Amino acid sequence: MNLSRQEQHTLHVLAKGRRIAHVRDSSGRVTSVECYSREGLLLTDCTLAVFKKLKTKKLIKSVNGQPYRINTTELNKVRAQLDNR
């Protein structure tokens, strides 16, 4: 599966247990998204366009209106990324 660098970075952050908070308008469409890292910092790579691509590819999902998280079946497909800590 071909993923852009921003999509990969967003998936790696989500794989560490983080979430994508979303805001919907009156018609139910997602108008803005914010992806938070483990430390609670805002991830700038996660834009509305990246969010829509990940959702279209069914890599992320939301259950009962909760924040979007990585799909459990896709969690195993994400390659490990070195964490420089």
Swiss-Prot record:
It comes from the Bacteria. It holds the Pfam family YjhX_toxin. GO terms for molecular function: DNA topoisomerase binding. Belongs to the UPF0386 family. This is UPF0386 protein YjhX. InterPro entries: YjhX_toxin (IPR018654). It comes from Escherichia coli (strain K12). NCBIfam families: PRK13687.1 (NF010240).
